[in-house]
Amino acid sequence: MEEQKKLVSQYAIDHYIKSNMHLGIGTGTTVFYAIKYLSDKIKSGDLKNLKLYPTSSDTKYLLAKENITYESKFTKFSKNIDITIDGADEILLEKKALIKGGGAAHLMEKIIAYNSHQLLIIADETKIVQTLGEKVSVPIEIVPDALPFITANLEKMNFNPVLRTCKFKAGPIITDNNNYILDVKMNIENPKGAEKYFKLLPGILEIGIFNHQNTKVIYYQNGQIKEI
């Protein structure tokens, strides 16, 4: 799968990323390869004058490791980002709907993506599903003090929310925005409706269901790179 991630990352950058772009940079293992290749293109002079908008502290670290400058403050943001390049945990191709947030960064990922003209998703073949939610849980970022209320409300809906923890630390995982993550297993028949519905609950800041109006998916399947 690592080779697939590398190939789709290189394809996406070669075909869609141009000099002088405002570019959102997502989070995750596939984006790692995109950053490495982006670094090569910048060093060779093939890509120049990029303004990069990272979506997480992990991404900032990887960019800094490659000596790539990025926008640390968005106070001068005056135009939509041209493209955000990112990965996904699940992809429903027919609706170009996604589940994201395995890296606990989907709040900022969605802010950057939904302020971009295009969301460019890169993925290996394991991320393609027939029903959204069939492999992974849906992450929901919440205000910490709202945990008991949101948990109770979700349980009334017959869901089983699980507070995300980490074996390397005590207590729940804390996001870059100092919030908690609830992982909720569900099969999603109406991705757009589900995205809107759950955000009506007070205390829910963002849900990891993505329905960007201009999504391009570049994925590896049956021995070749495909796009839709």
From Swiss-Prot:
InterPro entries: NagB/RpiA_transferase-like, Ribose5P_isomerase_typA_subgr, Ribose5P_isomerase_type_A
Entry EC number(s): 5.3.1.6
Catalytic activities: aldehydo-D-ribose 5-phosphate = D-ribulose 5-phosphate
Signal sequence coordinates: none
Residues binding substrate: 27-30, 86-89, 100-103, 127
Pathway stated in the Swiss-Prot or TrEMBL entry: Carbohydrate degradation; pentose phosphate pathway; D-ribose 5-phosphate from D-ribulose 5-phosphate (non-oxidative stage): step 1/1
Pfam families hit by this protein: Rib_5-P_isom_A
Enzyme class, UniProt record, top EC level: isomerase
GO molecular function, one term: ribose-5-phosphate isomerase activity
GO CC, any one term: cytosol
Keywords: Isomerase
Active-site positions on this chain: 109 (proton acceptor)
GO biological process: D-ribose metabolic process; pentose-phosphate shunt, non-oxidative branch
Quaternary structure, from the entry: Homodimer.
Similarity annotation: Belongs to the ribose 5-phosphate isomerase family.
Stated role: Catalyzes the reversible conversion of ribose-5-phosphate to ribulose 5-phosphate.
Record's protein name: Ribose-5-phosphate isomerase A
Organism: Borrelia hermsii (strain HS1 / DAH)
